[in-house]
């Protein structure tokens, strides 16, 4: 049994070539929910959905977001209607009192659907509507995710990191903003001064997540701050990782990041934006998989390979390196 911690696109790209190395039936994926937002009244869970769509064989592999060949009639009409009415596209937060009203899972990250600032496809939207409706019927996010996973025919077990609200808030010179506003709405601007995982001090992992963390854990080459940071900010997840075997794949080659905002976010929270900084962020890691061009010295065993993840063959190669690293420390 093995458990992958997933956020962003790094770990999903690794999972795309994992089946011949780690049996899907014996694999659990715990996904970040700090990036989730409520948009136009519907809960959008980007990191859960990337794995849901990947394993459901409908993921758009060009963007690693949304459903391949999806239409966007509703999104287009929302934009047209806002333009016709002279409404600013935002991102538009709901009023402060609305941020902590209603369903708890969406606290501190509620946005208006006026000219929605995230591109939501029509089939993708159906998932968000179904998820939110099931939550409003009284089900937990874990239970709803299980229902959606069954609908998409997943063999791997997919779990949210918690059923409690945790929101990734980026602190900037322009004030605090949710990660999705900073990354999607503002293209990674302004500069990062700090990152807060609001609600993490009161959140707990579910029994299902803690059971999964009893198994060997793999952290893919995802962003250590906003993809993994919300999980690590939950005390019982942090404790569990210190008590199990963990192998991590660096998203850097020395100080060059493969993609995404990891470097800016790491610098913003006082971590060196490099493989060395990733190792500092993961003090519980028993071994690392690094790129063959990465000579960073670490205090734990290292397996090196080409860590490029452009296709399934690349992903299988990196998974084989993870398997080797696990064999050395298990």
UniProtKB/Swiss-Prot annotation:
Signal peptide: none
Family named by the database record: Belongs to the CofD family.
Pfam families membership: CofD (PF01933)
Designated name of the protein: 2-phospho-L-lactate transferase
Class in the EC hierarchy, top level: transferase
Xref: NCBIfam families: F420_cofD
Gene Ontology MF, one: LPPG:FO 2-phospho-L-lactate transferase activity
Function recorded in the entry: Catalyzes the transfer of the 2-phospholactate moiety from (2S)-lactyl-2-diphospho-5'-guanosine to 7,8-didemethyl-8-hydroxy-5-deazariboflavin (FO) with the formation of oxidized coenzyme F420-0 and GMP.
Keyword Transferase among UniProt keywords: yes
Biological process terms in GO annotation: F420-0 metabolic process
Native source species: Haloarcula marismortui (strain ATCC 43049 / DSM 3752 / JCM 8966 / VKM B-1809)
Subunit and interaction comment: Homodimer.
Cofactor: Mg(2+)
EC number of this enzyme: 2.7.8.28
């Amino acid at each position: 049994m093995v458990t992958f911690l997933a956020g962003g696109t790094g770990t999903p790209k690794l999972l795309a070539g994992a089946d011949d190395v780690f049996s899907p039936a014996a694999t659990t994926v715990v996904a970040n929910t700090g990036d989730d937002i409520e948009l136009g009244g519907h809960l959008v869970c980007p990191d859960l959905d990337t794995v849901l769509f990947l394993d459901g064989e409908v993921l758009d592999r060009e963007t690693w977001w949304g459903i391949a060949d999806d239409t966007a009639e509703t999104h287009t009409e929302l934009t047209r209607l806002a333009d016709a009415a002279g409404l600013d596209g935002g991102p538009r937060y709901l009023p402060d009192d609305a941020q902590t009203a209603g369903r708890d899972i969406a606290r501190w990250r509620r946005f208006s659907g006026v000219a929605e600032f995230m591109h939501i496809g029509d089939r993708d939207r159906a998932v968000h509507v179904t998820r939110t409706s099931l939550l409003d019927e009284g089900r937990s996010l874990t239970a709803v995710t299980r229902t959606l996973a069954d609908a998409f025919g997943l063999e791997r077990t997919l779990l949210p990191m918690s059923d409690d609200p945790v929101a990734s808030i980026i602190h900037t010179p322009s004030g605090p903003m949710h990660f999705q506003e900073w990354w999607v709405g503002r293209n990674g601007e302004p500069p990062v001064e700090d990152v807060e995982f609001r609600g993490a001090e009161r959140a707990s992992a579910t029994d299902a997540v803690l059971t999964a963390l009893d198994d060997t854990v793999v952290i893919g080459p995802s962003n250590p701050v906003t993809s993994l940071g919300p999980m690590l900010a939950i005390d019982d997840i942090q404790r569990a990782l210190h008590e199990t075997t963990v192998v991590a794949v660096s998203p850097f080659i020395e100080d060059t990041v493969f993609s995404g905002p990891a470097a800016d976010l790491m610098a913003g929270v006082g971590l060196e934006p490099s493989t060395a900084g990733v190792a500092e962020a993961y003090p519980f890691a028993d071994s690392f998989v690094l790129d063959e061009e990465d000579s960073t010295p670490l205090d734990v065993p290292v397996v090196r390979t080409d860590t490029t993840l452009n296709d399934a063959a690349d992903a299988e190669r990196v998974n084989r390196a993870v398997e080797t690293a696990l064999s050395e420390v298990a």
